[in-house]
């Protein structure tokens, strides 16, 4: 899924977990321009837990030769998806301690313009990620929510835009 007319502006699938429960239940979109797939190894410590937060669709693909790219269409040699573009990693340590890391593969996830295009959902995801990493056993969390007076932007994936353009 991507923004209409711009296949590099991804609208990844939001996987259901502690970080994304609020976003996935509200059918929100996350916008990740120029995201790269995160490759996880099959061979890692038993104490690690890796959860997918954001994934691309089954029809996604990764361009191999971006510097000499002539088209955004899929070409032979391009890598088939789906890809993970956001992951949460946790590890249980001694003395009931835990390490928690969240990694997103697009720095523009933090961009104000990208956040506005999805009516604040990107910043909600970042806030939920920080909240997950900072939560502790007594249940205290971080809350940075604010009420925006901005207007909402209607985000329409490319397939839906093509469908509705027939009627307009």
Identify the meaning behind each predicted range:
Residues 1-140:
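Acidic, S/T/G-rich, low-cysteine, solvent-exposed domains in lumenal/extracellular/periplasmic regions
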Residues 116, 143-167:
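Short, aromatic-rich amphipathic segments at membrane interfaces
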């Amino acid at each position: 899924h991507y923004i209409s007319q711009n296949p590099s502006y991804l609208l990844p699938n939001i996987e259901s977990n502690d970080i994304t429960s609020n976003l996935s239940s509200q059918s929100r979109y996350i916008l990740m321009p120029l995201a790269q797939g995160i490759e996880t190894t099959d061979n890692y410590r038993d104490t690690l837990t890796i959860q997918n937060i954001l994934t691309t669709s089954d029809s996604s693909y990764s361009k191999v030769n971006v510097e000499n790219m002539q088209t955004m269409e899929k070409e032979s040699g391009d890598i088939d998806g789906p890809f993970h573009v956001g992951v949460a990693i946790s590890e249980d340590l001694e003395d009931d301690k835990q390490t928690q890391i969240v990694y997103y593969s697009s720095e523009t996830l933090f961009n104000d313009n990208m956040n506005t295009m999805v009516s604040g959902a990107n910043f909600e995801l970042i806030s939920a990620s920080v909240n997950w990493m900072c939560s502790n056993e007594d249940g205290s969390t971080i809350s940075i929510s604010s009420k925006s007076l901005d207007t909402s932007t209607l985000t329409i994936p490319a397939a839906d835009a093509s469908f509705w353009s027939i009627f307009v």
